[in-house]
């Protein structure tokens, strides 16, 4: 079967024209990515290139966490296209986060997971983040406190609460990921949780929960009654 070059497709079937006519929501993932890429390479039109990229990287999430330099080296991409992809995905990530941060209170562990799981479940190192909340449990700020192997010996309690004290936060939620993809709490996770809960009581900043994020899954230690006895 002979594949058509992009300019050989009927005008109404080309991604930009379809977007103008039907709106961005009507486009497939490959069509949206093709608009960012703009042009293909010899023998592969831009829509085919977009389909290949999404397949190779496992969709948008894979492209979001992909190394920029690796993308640059991919045939048909290069620095300019890689930068465009990364910038567009970062805009989407910030938009998704800001809509939750600015408008909605956190009511459940699922709300926090929805805010952070897509990004954190694919990190290749452990990250510990704090979600700072006001008196109505609206998100004030999200901070990355630590990157790397986390245990009770390396975590300084003061660092975890530093921004919460500065922002006069009413509560925090602690979130960290397991790069292995398994969200089961370790003994170290439980010990750290107990230390943080105790420190929060002294500082009058409630630790509402500690979430562990794995690959497409999360565990709420509060829901399991672990570390919050």
From Swiss-Prot:
Where is the signal peptide, in residue numbers? none
Where is Zn(2+) bound in this sequence? 176, 178, 189
Would you kindly state one Gene Ontology biological process term found in this protein's UniProt entry?
A: proteolysis
Database matches in InterPro entries: MPN, RadC_JAB, RuvA_2-like, UPF0758, UPF0758_CS, UPF0758_N
Q: Where is this motif: JAMM motif?
A: 176-189
Return the SUPFAM superfamilies for the record: JAB1/MPN domain, RuvA domain 2-like
Q: Which CDD domains match?
A: MPN_DUF2466
Which protein, by its recorded name, is this? UPF0758 protein Cagg_0777
Q: Which domain of life is it from?
A: Bacteria
**UniProt cross-references to NCBIfam families, sorted A to Z:** PRK00024.1, radc
Would you identify the family this protein belongs to, as annotated?
Answer: Belongs to the UPF0758 family.
All copies of the MPN domain together span: 105-227
Q: Which Pfam families match?
A: RadC, UPF0758_N
Q: Which keywords label this protein?
A: Hydrolase, Metal-binding, Metalloprotease, Protease, Zinc
Q: Does the keyword Lipid metabolism apply?
A: no
- Annotated source species: Chloroflexus aggregans (strain MD-66 / DSM 9485)
Quick check: keyword Zinc-finger in the entry?
no
Select a single GO molecular function from the record's annotations and give it.
metallopeptidase activity
């Amino acid at each position: 079967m002979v594949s058509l070059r992009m300019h050989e497709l009927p005008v109404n079937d080309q991604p930009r024209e379809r977007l103008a006519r039907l709106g961005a929501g009507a486009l497939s993932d490959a069509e949206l990515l093709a608009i960012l890429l703009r042009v293909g390479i010899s023998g592969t039109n831009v829509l085919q290139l977009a389909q290949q990229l999404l397949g190779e990287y496992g969709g948008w999430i894979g492209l979001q966490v992909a190394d920029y330099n690796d993308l640059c080296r991919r045939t048909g991409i290069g620095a300019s296209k890689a930068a465009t992809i990364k910038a567009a995905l970062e805009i989407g990530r910030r938009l998704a986060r800001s809509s939750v941060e600015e408008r909605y209170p956190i009511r459940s562990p699922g709300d926090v997971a929805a805010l952070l799981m897509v990004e954190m479940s694919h990190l290749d190192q452990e990250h510990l983040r704090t979600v700072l909340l006001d008196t109505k449990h609206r998100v004030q700020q999200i901070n990355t406190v630590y990157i790397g192997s986390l245990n009770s010996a390396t975590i300084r309690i003061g660092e975890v609460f530093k921004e919460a004290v500065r922002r006069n936060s009413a509560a925090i939620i602690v979130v960290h990921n397991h790069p292995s993809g398994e969200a089961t709490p370790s003994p170290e996770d439980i010990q750290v949780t107990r230390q943080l809960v105790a420190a929060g009581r002294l500082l009058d900043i409630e630790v509402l929960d500690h979430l562990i994020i794995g690959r497409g899954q999360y565990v709420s230690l509060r829901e399991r009654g672990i570390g919050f006895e």
